[in-house]
Amino acid sequence: MSIVVSKSAPVVVRPSEPATSTADKILLSTLDKPVATIPVTVLLAFDHPIHDATAETIKTALAQSLVHYYPIAGRISCDNDDGGHFYIDCTGEDLGVTFVAASANCTMEELMCLVDDQAPDDETAVVQQLAFNCTPDDLHHRLLWVQVTTLNCGGFVVGVTWSHGVADGPGIAQFIQAVGELARGLPSPSVVPVRLDDKIATQAVPPFTMAVHRFISGLKPVSNLDVRNVTVSSSLINHIIVGARRRATVFEAVAAVLWQCRTRVVMTDPEAPAVLLFAVNARKYLGAKDGYYGCCTAMHMAVSKSGTVANGDIMKLVGIIRRAKEQIPEQLKADDGEMMLRTMVGEKQVNGYESLLYLTSWRNIGFEDVDFGSGKTARVMTYPPRMLSMMPRIAPICFMLKATEEGVRVMSDCVTADHADAFYQEIAKLKATT
């Protein structure tokens, strides 16, 4: 089936009334700055229609939400007269976000079947048509782009692309939830948003997180990675959860599967370190205010020998990942991040492709709870090539998305085409053992 997505001309949506706060500048924190110019896209699918016109309802709620989240209507600027500090500029007549109304000649079932069958990085892939095609130049003028695509069945897909400098994953999920609440008729968002938090703004990046950033930036870039949708089955996840010495989490089970299966196909030296890098919502560790939606993400890692990861009991890998998570508070407080990192990784050479897997989880950060009036999100998706094309490719990456009855969906961008079939076969083999 050929699916055609028809788009209206982009329009600028501005706050529906003067903002609730009037700060002209919001300086980016040390956590915001490294990702200030990186665009990220999330696609949220909804099975049922809103009673009123879907696109217009969301557009109106978006304008109302910007009154409370007015910095999102701004733009990233650099103050060359004040040390070159990056900040969110909340002044000017052109404040607002970009909105596109679209339609597709298919049902949700037909669309999802095609999304699953197509390689996301294929230029003809329909997933590329479900969000605004943000360019590097767009990042100088806007912080948010929203596209609402309605389907023949009444379902719809909301594609949100945003600048990581204004919000991280949990932060933008909080904002989209607020849009949903106002679309449902609530007078104001249930969570009072905070973008200016003096404690976060003045706090240095934790030394261990800085050490991790320096570590990965020094690795050899990777290229020609194979982008595919893969599902880690519910039966395999449940087998691992129940079989672990201490009941495992879904994150630990899926991370162990991806880490082991990938290491099996890329490993060249069993003694070399295998590093599982993962992002952590650090709000509770850094003391961020409730409702803070700026970037508050820290990097952490689990490390073992490649041979252990590839050939060991997967329950042991779950334990390694769990212990790494338990060390997060200690790592965030450590004064000597470089020493802690060297202790974990050792002296062996770390190769960016063979040794490192970066896993970011979009589960349980709020995307599943968005509701514009017709029920909560049915499926969470992303389109990483658009984001990854605008940043150095250092680490092979996997995006862990919303769970379904079949299992946890993962957008995999972690192996080359030469290793792709073997990687997916390893996942199938693990499933066959349950």
Curated annotation (Swiss-Prot):
GO function term, MF aspect, one: hydroxycinnamoyltransferase activity
UniProt KW keywords: Acyltransferase, Transferase
Enzyme Commission numbers on file: 2.3.1.-
Active site (UniProt): H164, D371
Stored Pfam families: Transferase (PF02458)
InterPro entries: CAT-like_dom_sf, Plant_acyltransferase
Disulfide bonds: none
Similarity comment text for this entry: Belongs to the plant acyltransferase family.
Note: Plants over-expressing AT15 have significant reduction of ferulate in leaf cell wall.
Role description: Involved in the incorporation of ferulate into the cell wall.
Protein name per its UniProtKB record: Acyl transferase 15
Organism, scientific name: Oryza sativa subsp. japonica (Rice)
